[in-house]
Amino acid sequence: PLLISQLVRIACLQMALQPVWEGLKDERWSPQQLAVIENQLAKIDLLKGYRISLLGERDFANLMIDQMGDNPKSAGMLLENDGTIPGYWLIPQGWIYHLQRRLNEMHVKFSQRIVDPKARRIRPDIAVTFATEVQARSSRSFPIFDVLSSMLLPAIEKVAIKIGSSQTAVDHTRTACLLELHKLEHNKYPAQLTDLKTPFP
């Protein structure tokens, strides 16, 4: 799984949540239907999905870099060299390893820390620092050791923020279903969320 799969997942969720809210507004859902919807929403963990897809991005990048080391022509293709520029096959192995180290350094220091699935937190401060560092690396006059970082890392912080807002939308919808279930059972909304039978998100 890659980040693009999470973006597609978010797009599908946005379309799926709209009719749920319309049904809640018009009080069309039965208790059984609400229970099914709430149960399905409870299984959705976009923060965990982000982390899994980010590890996939990192593993995919490392695979490409390994292929660059094994086959110099792969490096030429990745760097958009169609072979008309001589000497791309002379790229030293040490340079490739340094590219790999710099790329993984960005993942370990920043992108993998933007989202904390266990604490259920998004860290915008780390996302901003990450974006600033990517920009600084790519804007150097001769970013020879950050070529891959510039190509493979941009926009990760935006995806993390989007995933956070989408998970919030899922949690809000689930909470609304629990509130409606309580209302159907007791003919009124609970005085506080802790009165719900199922712990709210």
Predicted regions and their residues:
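Short acidic linear motifs
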Residues: P1-P201
